[in-house]
């Protein structure tokens, strides 16, 4: 099969409007993914607020319209809420949210939630270590939950 130089494919475009007010910020994002026949549209609202005591709160919500799908399966949504702040020599954080984007099934959107907690600390001037634990709920009540532990090490020179 011969490939054309300008073969039609997937097109994506988006726009973002954001405001940063120092100790708070908000962004509104719109995106479209076109695959020739179908057009998926996504809108998201994200924000953060930093308290005077060093604790930061962040949250986000995304809603998608899945073009070309049946009326009972044409929406998706995702959301998260997080909190972090300085504890000792590092930063402690936790978050709860959807495990990716949830897609409507038979007129309802099933929730698959994920939880995480981390502690990030500098070992020296050029290296940061971040241990993390997470729990991801099973996609159905019959499916097993997933628990994971990982360690991220970041280097800078």
Regions found by a protein language model. Give the residues of each.
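Surface-exposed loop and membrane-interface regions of Gram-negative outer-membrane beta-barrel proteins
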Residues: 2-11, 36, 67-70, 137-145
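Short active-site-adjacent structural elements
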Residues: 102-105, 127, 137-142
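C-terminal structured domain segments
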Residues: 115-123
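Acidic carboxylate-rich catalytic motifs and surrounding loops in phosphoryl-/glycosyl-chemistry enzymes
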Residues: 1, 29, 133
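Detector for outer-membrane/organellar transmembrane beta-barrel domains
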Residues: 10-114
């Amino acid at each position: 099969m011969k490939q054309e130089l300008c073969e039609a494919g997937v097109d994506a475009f988006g726009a973002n409007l954001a405001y940063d007010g120092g100790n708070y910020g908000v962004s509104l994002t719109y995106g479209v993914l076109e695959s020739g026949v179908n057009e998926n549209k996504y809108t998201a609202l994200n924000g953060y607020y930093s308290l005077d005591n060093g604790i930061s709160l962040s949250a986000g919500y995304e809603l998608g319209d899945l073009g070309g799908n049946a009326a009972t399966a044409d929406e998706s949504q995702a959301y998260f809420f997080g909190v972090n702040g300085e504890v000792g020599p590092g930063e402690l954080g936790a978050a709860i949210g959807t495990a990716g984007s949830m897609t409507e099934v038979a007129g309802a959107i099933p929730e698959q939630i994920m939880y995480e907690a981390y502690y990030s600390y500098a070992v020296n001037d050029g290296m940061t270590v971040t241990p993390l634990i997470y729990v991801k709920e099973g996609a159905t009540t019959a499916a097993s939950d997933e628990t994971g532990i990982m360690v991220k090490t970041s280097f800078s020179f």
